[in-house]
A protein has these predicted regions:
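A short glycine-rich, Lys/Arg-flanked "PGG" loop and its adjoining helix->strand segment in the class I
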Residues: 66-78
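Hydrophobic adenine-recognition pocket in adenosine-nucleotide-binding enzymes
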Residues: 58
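A conserved beta-strand element that flanks and buttresses the S-adenosyl-L-methionine
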Residues: 54
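Conserved beta-strand signature within the Rossmann-like core of class I S-adenosyl-L-methionine
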Residues: 79-87
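Acceptor-substrate binding/catalytic loop of class I
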Residues: 92-108, 130
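Conserved S-adenosyl-L-methionine
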Residues: 118-128
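Core SAM-dependent methyltransferase catalytic element
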Residues: 126-145
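Class I SAM-dependent methyltransferase SAM/SAH-binding core
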Residues: 1-42
Length: 145
């Protein structure tokens, strides 16, 4: 996501729990700040507020997303936007899929965000291609309440 955001951003921070992913991001030379760390711990301990928070292909590694949503909310300004993607599952809640990634139901996302975010938009999308198959999901855009 960073490449797409660089031209419209005055400051770009990236957070990833994987040192390897941060090393790859460094090679792009587009970030002003890169942090190796857990997203919840990093955002919860920071006083920095962001205009736009983007978490594409992040929640697929997180089952219970409430603490992530709360940490993101803490890092929002009053007019911030929070954009994220999930692999959608039909059953309520979330579960570990055969792919070893988490799927989340639309209802789960809406329930977990109800008290801290308002939905701006959501779209069903093709998230990524694996082999010959597209992985379908959903992208949400929220603003803080």
């Amino acid at each position: 996501a960073g490449k797409s955001l660089r031209d419209i951003s005055s400051h770009l921070t990236g957070i990833d729990i994987s040192e390897n992913m941060i090393s790859e991001a460094l090679k792009l030379d587009i970030y002003d700040n890169l942090i190796v760390g857990d997203i919840v711990e990093t955002l919860s301990s920071s006083q920095e507020k962001f205009d736009l928070l983007v978490a594409l292909d992040v929640l697929i590694y997180i089952g219970d997303a409430l603490s992530t949503f709360q940490a993101v909310r803490k890092s929002c300004k009053s007019d911030s936007l929070f954009v994220f993607s999930v692999e959608i599952q039909e059953e309520d809640g979330y579960s570990l899929l055969k792919s070893s990634r988490y799927g989340h139901s639309d209802r789960y996302i809406m329930d977990q965000t109800a008290e801290i975010f308002d939905l701006v938009d959501s779209q069903n999308v093709r998230l990524r291609k694996e082999g010959d198959n597209w992985i379908n999901g959903k992208v949400y855009v929220f603003r803080p309440i």
